[in-house]
Amino acid sequence: MANEKLLEIKNLTVHYQSHDATVHAVENLNLSLGNGETLGLVGETGAGKTTTVKTIMRILPTPPARVVSGEIFFDGQDLLKISEKEMRKIRGKEIAMIFQDPMTSLNPVMTVADQIAEVIRLHDGGSRAEAHKKACDMLELVGIRPERGSDYPHQFSGGMKQRVVIAMALACNPRFLIADEPTTALDVTIQAQVLELMKKLKAQYQTAMVMITHDLGIVAEICDYVAIMYAGEVVEYGTREHIFNSTAHPYTKGLFACIPDIFTEQNELVPINGLTPDPTDLPQGCRFNPRCPYATERCRQEHPENVEIEPGHFVACHLINGGGNENA
């Protein structure tokens, strides 16, 4: 993790309360990120990735969501303790988010330039003309002709809409960008274009970024650090090289085993058995133990702690941390 931390999350726990149960969405999460770095949050649906970033943005619906404990420091300021008025000055200006589905992220009755200009005027001020000019400049930056700023969202393809959303997120030069599966709704060729664009803009503006994805190919392409999440917890954290070259946790190994490898003669993919646990009724001990082929009695009884197995590489697994098979 970086010496100069822009973002630092400490012991974050977030629950959702239903009429008859508590959903344990995120439990005791610890992460940090430095200026200009990219962190990949990887895991299956329901791992707690989106809840984590929405907590950073403070856009979780409350109720039913509730931050039980923890701190989120951005540039030394705890975002969970400031007022909503103060947070509005940060949200969109210092911290911006690219949402998962560009089709539903844009207002259908406003031109795309007006939508970008609205963000610019809210945070940077200036006249309508100045904001509109900058909005058109941002469209050009993401590869859209400025004259198309007068068009409405329905006049753009899915990939072009995602470019508009990226332009809107970057309009105020945020120091920290959150991208929630920004390429999920796009076809493969457009995915590649959008990723290349994000890499270029990240380098140009030195923006720190959290990328939520379940695609390890995207992680390899764009991330410096990786946090593998399972059932609300980070089970493995390290640099991209740690995760790809020194995979340690059985769950992480299971994710890689699900990916076709053109360099082997393997004929079948090896899926991870079972399903993610019910977040209202989590298993005792390690949360992955019901699906883990190497689980021991200790795994079923004791919750594993995160241990640093090499500098900067953390794993929460009894098999790695002592008392089990290190080659699991």
Predicted features by range, described:
Residues K5, G149, T239-A328:
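Short catalytic/signature loops enriched in Gly
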Residues R58, I178, P182, L186-N267:
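P-loop NTP-binding/switch modules centered on Walker-like glycine-rich loops
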Residues E71-D78, A129-E147, F256-A257:
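Conserved ABC ATPase "signature" region
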Residues L79-A96, L122, H242-T247, P277-P283:
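ABC ATPase NBD coupling module
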Residues D151-F156, M160:
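Conserved ABC ATPase signature
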Residues A171-R175:
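A short, proline-enriched helix->beta-strand linker immediately N-terminal to the Walker B motif
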